Regions:
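Long, hydrophobic, amphipathic alpha-helical segments used as structural scaffolds
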Residues: 23-26, 30, 34, 62, ...
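Secondary-structure capping and boundary motifs in well-ordered enzyme cores
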Residues: 39-57, 75, 79, 148, ...
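Short secondary-structure subsegments characteristic of cysteine-rich extracellular domains
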Residues: 61-88
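Glycine-rich flavin
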Residues: 87, 100, 158, 165-274
Length: 274
């Protein structure tokens, strides 16, 4: 790790230590004979949800640190900012939830606290934003895509610009249903089958392809674009892991073609769909 990223690495390491401490504490509350008791888990569901969220953010920060190591100052600065945001978010949550957790959590002191304060200053964030805006291309730095992934990105970017973005504002502001014509066009593009193996009528390549497609559709509209690709992915993965072969043969081709449109019903403790 270069010196330019040393403070970021130190702070994220401390975040990982704190989360492991909380995770062990919660595991002691929900575990029975080395298994999770769902009733006990339900009693600490908000805390478990937050631990999962902060773990995801911390893991993303660790991946970003690895990525930035191979690039320059612009990428370093973006990475430092994300690491600081991740640690500050975790610090706020632990500080106000220690009584609920029943645990004194290892905090961010000294150098780590100074790092967060420095990176989250308004002037620093503004300077990073201006640097992103000023770049003619790759505002967030190079992705490192292969030629195939670049082609996927271009294809979905074009579709998002031409088909999704023009209806995004109307759909969102007036709470309209996604037009049938857009769903049909998505089916023809293979949007619904991008997470389904070809033996079941899909066109799964790899998870990076799914991420690229989701990002480009979300750029056009999260509601009318990005969310449409994640719903069949959630359902397809559940069927692939837990379904019988008969269920896979019956449902997956219909999902991949768009014949059956998938929706989800979820609950998030203390969040939007609670």
């Amino acid at each position: 790790m270069t010196d330019a990223l040393a403070a970021s690495q130190d702070a994220i390491t401390q975040a990982r230590i704190a989360l492991e401490q909380i995770g062990r504490h919660l595991a002691g509350k929900v575990g029975v004979e080395r298994r999770v008791d769902t009733q006990r888990l339900n009693r600490v569901q908000p805390e478990a949800f937050q631990v999962a969220r902060h773990l995801a953010q911390t893991t993303a920060a660790e991946a970003m640190l690895q990525w930035a190591r191979n690039h320059g100052e612009h990428e370093h600065e973006l990475t430092r900012l994300y690491c600081a945001m991740t640690c500050a978010d975790l610090s706020r949550w632990t500080r106000f939830n220690e009584p609920q957790l029943g645990l004194k959590v290892a905090g961010f002191d000294g150098i780590d606290a100074d790092f967060m304060t420095e990176m989250l200053a308004t002037e620093r964030i503004s300077a990073i934003g201006q640097a992103v805006i000023a770049r003619d291309s790759l505002p967030a730095g190079p992705y490192g895509h292969s030629e195939t992934h670049q082609m996927v990105q271009q294809q979905f970017a074009r579709f998002s610009d031409e088909k999704v973005a023009p209806i995004a504002e109307e759909t969102h502001c007036h709470d309209k249903l996604i037009p049938e014509e857009l769903l049909q066009a998505m089916g023809e593009l293979g949007v619904f089958g991008i997470s389904i193996p070809d033996e079941y009528g899909g066109m799964f390549m790899d998870h990076r392809t799914m991420i690229i497609a989701t990002e480009e559709l979300s750029r056009g509209s999260l509601g009318a674009g990005g969310s449409v690709i994640t719903r069949p992915e959630i359902c397809a993965k559940a069927i692939l892991v837990g379904g019988t072969e008969e269920q896979k043969q019956h449902w997956l081709p219909k999902i991949a073609s768009g014949e059956h449109i998938v929706s989800v019903a979820v609950t998030e403790p203390d969040a939007g769909s609670d």
